[in-house]
A protein has these predicted regions:
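Elongated, amphipathic alpha-helical interaction scaffolds
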Residues: 1-277
Length: 277
């Protein structure tokens, strides 16, 4: 349960910081339709399933409107970190509860982030032999079906973070990390956003020592100025991770501490090679 809470927190922080970039990257038609100049993140809502005795909390709920129209539109984003047989039904229940409470249009979005490739449904139907009763649709994003190489030229920060959750082979892990660092260098974000993206990426793609050595070799092949910026980014993340790990000592701290240790290995090797920092 704690692990689920940690994953939910990471995605919530990423999407609340880069909501417009997320919608633009994966749902361009929705991006063109909604007014992102006027968005408000609503408090997470808790729904109780009395029949099953379960409680579920809405992951992300955004209040906005359509361009050129009056009235409120809600965008509901649900992150699903593990396969669930009745997930489509749960999306419908969330939708119906939100509509019942707010009485406005709701755009439901499901993000599937687990590594297994599955054909996830994007609808929930209730039918009789003699008539259809319900055909509920929702938008879906199955990250593991997206090729990471299709996004490495993007300047979208969400694309950089989510490289770690996209479809790649084990032998590509080093290259994925290298391209992630290149994207950060190119985007030149402020330190807070840089730390957020690095923390997210390092949580889901942690290189082993052999892979770190290979990454060192690859960084040694790039332009020296670019390599220096990569080292600076890694150094900043290492320092913040060490402080946070000492302060928290929780699950998140342990994950970041592990990533931080690997960053230290890479830094020691690169400092010897380039002789700075």
């Amino acid at each position: 349960m704690k692990k689920r809470i940690g994953h939910d927190r990471l995605f919530k922080e990423l999407l609340e910081t880069f909501f417009g970039e997320f919608i633009e990257l994966f749902f361009p038609q929705l991006y063109d339709a909604i007014d992102l100049e006027h968005t408000k993140f609503l408090q997470q809502e808790m729904f109780t399933d009395v029949t099953r005795g379960d409680k579920h909390r809405i992951d992300i709920l955004v209040e906005t409107s359509l361009k050129g129209e009056s009235g409120i539109v809600l965008v509901h984003v649900e992150n699903q970190a593990s396969a669930q047989k009745d997930f489509a039904e749960r999306m419908f229940i969330y939708f119906s509860r939100l509509y019942q409470k707010h009485r406005c249009r709701v755009v439901p979005i499901a993000i599937f982030t687990y590594p297994e490739k599955r054909n996830e449904p994007d609808r929930f139907k209730l039918l009789f032999p003699f008539m259809p009763v319900l055909d509920f649709h929702f938008l879906t994003l199955e990250l593991n079906k997206h090729n990471w190489q299709d996004y490495i030229q993007s300047n979208n920060p969400v694309a950089a973070a989510l490289l770690s959750k996209m479809g790649y082979q084990k032998k590509e892990r080093v290259q994925v990390k290298l391209e992630f660092l290149r994207m950060l260098v190119r985007m030149e974000l402020d330190p807070a956003r840089m730390t957020l993206l690095t923390g997210f990426f390092e949580t889901y793609l942690i290189l082993n020592e052999e892979e770190e050595r290979k990454l060192e070799e690859e960084i040694g092949k790039v332009d020296e100025k670019e390599a220096k910026r990569m080292i600076e980014i890694t150094t900043s993340w290492e320092e913040k991770g060490r402080v946070k790990g000492r302060m928290e000592g929780r699950m998140e701290g342990r994950v970041e501490g592990k990533a931080e240790g690997q960053a230290s290995l890479l830094l020691r090797q690169l400092k010897k090679k380039f002789g700075y920092l």
